[in-house]
Every structure is written in structure tokens, then in C-alpha cells.
């Protein structure tokens, strides 16, 4: 199938995302790992497409994202980039590929040459020098804080972050430090909704939430989760958008609409402190 985009749809750039955030217009983001789904998401009006290392879970059947390699991320980025026309395409730097600023830059260059327009890194304020190094060298960055799946063993499992006073204070420091280092987007995962809303208000850049409440600038889900086709455990923050829909396209459009009108995430998809 060939998707004919609305000719009025403009290419989504970092300044466009910032303008959406400033205007209070919600940003819809989903994952895609191949050309066909990237084309469909773009056609349905998704502003950001993430080639996530979650492909380790939903494409490879891994229990964690840790086994995913840079070469695999580059391959899937190339595939998704061929299908995407206007959405902003970002790609995860996989586990172990950004221990130093220089290593992070080399890894990011590989992904940018494969078609990524931004890279995503997981971590806290300790990442600031790496983010600064990348941004100074024209690599756009999305900083991922809160529950960082690459740290699953260090965190003791997939647990909500920022529930204690100390944990909340650390997330506030993380967000501000990463913004100051130059991150153009901050993604928060599994963070109490009130805290995520507070952090969003404290930042000048857009925030994207996954299990972080409705007050973030936008939302993201793993495509296979929101289509209810992943056989693993369903996280609390996931909603089945295929329910009652006649097609995958309709489900994706329902997701975009729900993000835009603020009906997703609802209270049952969020966490409290």
C-alpha cells in the first residue's frame, strides 16, 4: 500500500516540536522498526517515530533491551527512515555504546548516517557531559530519565522511579542538568504523574511521557503494546488502541487523537507517589 500524505503536513523539526510545546499542542510519538510501519505512522500524523531498543523485546523476543547491538539499531533505523517522510525520526543508543563522550559521538554518527535525526540516551545528570559533547557536534539529543530499561538490573527490575523525596529530587536535578547540557527533548518513563508535571513545568524543552501522566508535552508507546500484539506482560501505562477498531490505521489514528485531546493517558495509566 502506498500512503499519500496530506500535502499540508510539514516536516516535523526540532523547532516545530518546540513550537508545539510552547503552544500547548500535544506531541504524539510511537515506535517503528521497519519501513512499512514507519510509513503508516507518518501517514497517520505521528510527529515523532522512535526506533527503540525495545526492538529487543518485541522483535527479537529478548527479556531486556541489553542484548541489542549498534549494528542492529542502525539496520532498523535505515529501514524506518526509508518509510518515513515527515515525522522526526529518533533512535536509541543501545546499552554500552556511550560510556564516554567520544564513544557516544562515534555511535551517534553511525545512527545519524543510517537516517536518525536525533538520538536518545538513558541516564541521569551524569550524562550531561556526554549530551553536551554530542549537541556541540550537531547531534540532536533526547534524554531519557526515570525508569531506564538499560539499567533494569541496577534498578532491581522495572519499577516506578521518583516515589521517594530523594528520588524525586534526583529526577528534578537530572532533567535540569540534561536540559542545560543541550538536550532538546526529555523523555520520562514510569514517573509519578504529579512529579512529571512539575518537571515539565520547570523545563523549557518538550517532555515526552510513557507512564508519566498527562501533563507531559507528549506521549509515547511501543507500537506492539498499543496494538495489543506483544505477548509479554502489559505495563500499567499501556492502553489497547486496537480495541473496537477495524484496522491498525484506525488504531494509530485513535492513539494520535487521544494524545491530542488529552484523554490518554487516563488515571488508570498513571502512577502516584
From Swiss-Prot:
Give the molecular function GO annotations: 3-methyl-2-oxobutanoate hydroxymethyltransferase activity; magnesium ion binding
Pfam families found in the cross-reference section: Pantoate_transf (PF02548)
Cofactor mode of binding and number, as noted: Binds 1 Mg(2+) ion per subunit.
Q: Please name the pathway.
A: Cofactor biosynthesis; (R)-pantothenate biosynthesis; (R)-pantoate from 3-methyl-2-oxobutanoate: step 1/2
The reaction(s) this protein catalyses: 3-methyl-2-oxobutanoate + (6R)-5,10-methylene-5,6,7,8-tetrahydrofolate + H2O = 2-dehydropantoate + (6S)-5,6,7,8-tetrahydrofolate
Top-level taxon of origin:
Bacteria
Q: Which InterPro entries match?
A: Pantoate_hydroxy_MeTrfase, Pyrv/PenolPyrv_kinase-like_dom, Pyrv_kinase-like_dom_sf
Compartments, record wording: Cytoplasm
Q: Which residues form the active site?
A: 189 (proton acceptor)
Quote the record's binding site residues for 3-methyl-2-oxobutanoate: 53-54, 92, 120
What are its E.C. numbers? 2.1.2.11
Its keywords, alphabetically, are: Cytoplasm, Magnesium, Metal-binding, Pantothenate biosynthesis, Transferase
At the top of the EC hierarchy, this enzyme's class is transferase
Q: Give the binding site residues for Mg(2+).
A: 53, 92, 122
Cellular component terms (Gene Ontology): cytoplasm
| Function of the molecule | Catalyzes the reversible reaction in which hydroxymethyl group from 5,10-methylenetetrahydrofolate is transferred onto alpha-ketoisovalerate to form ketopantoate.
Hey, which family's this protein in? Belongs to the PanB family.
What's the name of the protein? 3-methyl-2-oxobutanoate hydroxymethyltransferase
Give the species this sequence originates from. Cupriavidus taiwanensis (strain DSM 17343 / BCRC 17206 / CCUG 44338 / CIP 107171 / LMG 19424 / R1) (Ralstonia taiwanensis (strain LMG 19424))
Q: Which gene encodes it?
A: panB
Amino acid at each position: 500500500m502506498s500512503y499519500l500524505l496530506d500535502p499540508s503536513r510539514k516536516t516535523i523539526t526540532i523547532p516545530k516540536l518546540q513550537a508545539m510545546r510552547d503552544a500547548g499542542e500535544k506531541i504524539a510519538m510511537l515506535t517503528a522498526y521497519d519501513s512499512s510501519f514507519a510509513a503508516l505512522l507518518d501517514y497517520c500524523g505521528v510527529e515523532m517515530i522512535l526506533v527503540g531498543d525495545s526492538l529487543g523485546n518485541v522483535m527479537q523476543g529478548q527479556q531486556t533491551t541489553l542484548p541489542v547491538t549498534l549494528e542492529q539499531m542502525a539496520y532498523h533505523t535505515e529501514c524506518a527512515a526509508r518509510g518515513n517522510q515527515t515525522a522526526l525520526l529518533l533512535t536509541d543508543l543501545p546499552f554500552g555504546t556511550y560510556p564516554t563522550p567520544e564513544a557516544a559521538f562515534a555511535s551517534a554518527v553511525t545512527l545519524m548516517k543510517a537516517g536518525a535525526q536525533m538520538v536518545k540516551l538513558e541516564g541521569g545528570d551524569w550524562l550531561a557531559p556526554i549530551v553536551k559533547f554530542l549537541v556541540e557536534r550537531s547531534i540532536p539529543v533526547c534524554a531519557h530519565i526515570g525508569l531506564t530499561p538499560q539499567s533494569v538490573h541496577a534498578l532491581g527490575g522495572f519499577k516506578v522511579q521518583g516515589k521517594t523525596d530523594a528520588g524525586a529530587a534526583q529526577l528534578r536535578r537530572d532533567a535540569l542538568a540534561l536540559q542545560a547540557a543541550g538536550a532538546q527533548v526529555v523523555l520520562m518513563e514510569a514517573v509519578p504523574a504529579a512529579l512529571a508535571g512539575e518537571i515539565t513545568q520547570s523545563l523549557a524543552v518538550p517532555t515526552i511521557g510513557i507512564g508519566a501522566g498527562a501533563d507531559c508535552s507528549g506521549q509515547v508507546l511501543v507500537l506492539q503494546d498499543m496494538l495489543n500484539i506483544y505477548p509479554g506482560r502489559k505495563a500499567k501505562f499501556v492502553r489497547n488502541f486496537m480495541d473496537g477498531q477495524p484496522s491498525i490505521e484506525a488504531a494509530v489514528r485513535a492513539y494520535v487523537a487521544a494524545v491530542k485531546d488529552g484523554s490518554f493517558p487516563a488515571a488508570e495509566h498513571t502512577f502516584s507517589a
